Regions:
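Substrate-binding pocket helix/loop in short-chain dehydrogenase/reductase
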Residues: 100-101, 105-110
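Residue(s) in the substrate-gating loop at a strand-loop-helix junction
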Residues: 145
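Conserved glycine-rich cofactor-binding loop
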Residues: 10, 17-19
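The beta1-alpha1 cofactor-binding region of Rossmann-like NAD(H)/NADP(H)-dependent oxidoreductases
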Residues: 42-43, 63-74, 106
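SDR active-site lid
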Residues: 178-247
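Conserved glycine-rich Rossmann-like NAD(P)H-binding loop of the short-chain dehydrogenase/reductase
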Residues: 31-47
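Active-site helix of classical SDR
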Residues: 124, 161
C-alpha cells in the first residue's frame, strides 16, 4: 500500500518530543500532513507544535505513557474522536540502557521492555482496528533498530526489545496482508541522538570515559534524525516493508544474512573500538 500524496493525511507519532520523533513530525508536516504528536512529557511537544504549525498544517499534542495500556486506549479514543482513523501510525517512543549484562542490575529491564516493545503493541492494538475499518491505504511504522539485526554488546535489554519489535512487526504484516493497512519495520543505524546516554540510563559500572568515547563515535559516524525522518516519509510513499536508514543499517542487515560469523567479528571489533566492550 503506497501513499504517494501525504497532503491532508493524519500522521500520529509517539515519542515526538525530540530526536527521530520530532524530525518525523516536521518531515511529514513538510509534505502537507497533519500531525498528532505524543510524548511522556507535554513541554517538549509545545515547541514541536509551533514548528509544525509554522509549516501550515495542524498539530495536536498529547502527553501519554506508551507503556500504560489504559492510557494508550484513552489516548486512541481521544484521537479518534478528534480526527477519526489515522492514516499513518508511527510507533517511535523508545528508551535505552547501556551496560554489560552481567555488570548491570535487572531493574531497568521491565520499564525498557514496557516502553520499547509494549508501547508498540499498545499503539498497534488501539489504533489499527479503526485504520482497517476506515479503508486504505494506510500504514504503520514500527521503529525497531539495527540493534535488532545484530548482537550489540552492552545493550542487551535494548537489543532484545528491538529484536522483539522486528519479530512482532513481521507477524503483524502477515496477519494484515488481506487489509489495506501496511506495516513497515524501521531499522535506524548509527543516529546522533541522546537516546543511549539519556534515554533511560547507564549502568554504574560504565566509566565516564566509555560514555565520552561512545558519544564521540556517534557524533563522528552518526547521521542526524532528519535523515531517518526523510527515509520514513519515503517508506510510506513507496509502501516499503522495511526501512533501513542511517550509517551501517543496510550493511548489517545484509551481512547477517550472508554470514553470522562475519557479523560477530565486525561487531566485536567495533564494540572494542567505541567502548561497548
Amino acid at each position: 500500500m503506497t501513499i504517494p500524496d501525504l497532503r491532508g493525511k493524519q500522521v500520529l507519532i509517539t515519542g515526538a518530543g525530540s530526536g527521530i520523533g520530532r524530525a518525523a513530525a516536521l518531515a511529514f508536516a513538510q509534505c502537507g500532513a497533519h500531525i498528532i504528536a505524543s510524548d511522556i512529557q507535554l513541554a517538549p511537544l509545545e515547541a514541536v507544535k509551533k514548528e509544525v504549525e509554522a509549516l501550515g498544517v495542524a498539530c495536536l499534542i498529547h502527553a501519554v505513557d506508551v507503556a500504560n495500556e489504559a492510557a494508550m486506549k484513552e489516548y486512541a479514543d481521544r484521537v479518534h474522536a478528534q480526527v477519526g482513523a489515522v492514516d499513518v501510525l508511527i510507533n517511535n517512543a523508545g528508551i535505552a540502557y547501556l551496560g554489560l549484562f552481567l555488570h548491570s542490575d535487572l531493574d531497568h529491564w521491565p520499564r525498557l521492555m514496557n516502553v520499547n516493545l509494549m508501547g508498540v503493541v499498545h499503539g498497534c492494538r488501539h489504533f489499527i482496528p479503526k485504520m482497517i475499518a476506515a479503508g486504505g491505504p494506510r500504514r504503520v511504522l514500527n521503529v525497531a533498530s539495527s540493534a535488532g539485526n545484530y548482537p550489540a554488546p552492552s545493550m542487551a535489554a535494548y537489543a532484545a526489545s528491538k529484536y522483539a519489535v522486528a519479530g512482532f512487526s513481521e507477524v503483524l504484516k502477515m496477519e494484515l496482508a488481506q487489509t489495506q493497512v501496511g506495516i513497515t519495520t524501521v531499522c535506524p543505524g548509527i543516529i546522533n541522538t541522546a537516546i543511549v546516554t539519556t534515554g533511560a540510563g547507564v549502568a554504574p559500572s560504565v566509566p565516564a570515559s566509555q560514555i565520552a568515547k561512545l558519544q564521540a563515535y556517534y557524533v563522528a559516524k552518526g547521521c542526524t534524525p532528519e535523515v531517518v525522518a526523510a527515509d520514513m516519509v519515503r517508506a510510506v510513499q513507496k509502501g516499503q516493508d522495511i526501512c533501513l536508514t542511517g550509517p551501517g543499517a543496510t550493511l548489517v542487515y545484509h551481512l547477517k544474512r550472508l554470514s553470522l560469523k562475519l557479523v560477530r567479528m565486525a561487531t566485536i571489533a567495533t564494540a572494542k573500538r567505541i567502548g561497548y566492550l
